[in-house]
Amino acid sequence: PAWAAARFRTFMLEKVRRQDEAAFVRALRDFRVGRVWGDSARILQSRVRSNPPSTMPRLFTHNVQVDKWNMFQLSELPGEETVLHAEQSGPELQREFLTRNLLTPATLHVKPGALVMFTVNKNEPNRSEPLFVNGQIGTVQDVEPGAVVVKTKAGTVIRVERFTWRYDAQDEDSAAFSQFPLRLAWAMTIHKAQGLTLDSAFLD
C-alpha cells in the first residue's frame, strides 16, 4: 500500500549530456545494442593499439585479473614494497560493506614509481580548485610515516594522508574505514571505473 501511495512516476532520459560529439554519441548508442559496423566500427578501429603505454590504465572484467596485472607491474619496479593496511571499526556487516564497495583496497601495496589513482576528492580552504580528485592519476614518490607522497601528471607533489569513510556519515557509531585514498592504477575493473573521469584507458 505504501508503495502504491507513493505514486512514483517513470521518466525516460533521451538526451545524452556527458558527450557532445554527435558521431561518438551515435557510436555509443550502436554499441549498446550490439551494432558494430559502419562509422561506429571505424571509430573503434581508429583506437586500436598493439602496444599501449604501461601507464595507461587497463580495464578488466574481474578483480582477479586486475590484481594480477597491478601486482605484476609493481613487481617490475625496483625498490622496497610497502604494505599499508586499513584501520577499521564498527559493526562487522557494515565493515564488510565498506570493504566490498570502496575503490580503496583494505590492503594497499605501494613503492616509489607505482602508478596510483586517487579515490576521493580533496578540497582545501584556500584553493579555488581541488587538491586532487577521484580518478586522477599520479606516481608514488616516497612513503613516509603517516603519508604517501604522490606526484600528479601536472607535476604537483602531494602528501596524501589517511582518509576515513563511514557507513553512515551522520552516525559516529557506524563502521569506519581509514586508509590512504589511493589504489594501484595500472588496472581496474570496468565496474569500478564507472563514474570516473579517465584521460585514457586500454581494453582488450
PLM feature segments, named:
Residues P1-V133, T139-Q141:
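Conserved helicase motor core of P-loop NTPases
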Residues K122-N123, R127-D204:
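Conserved helicase C-terminal RecA-like lobe
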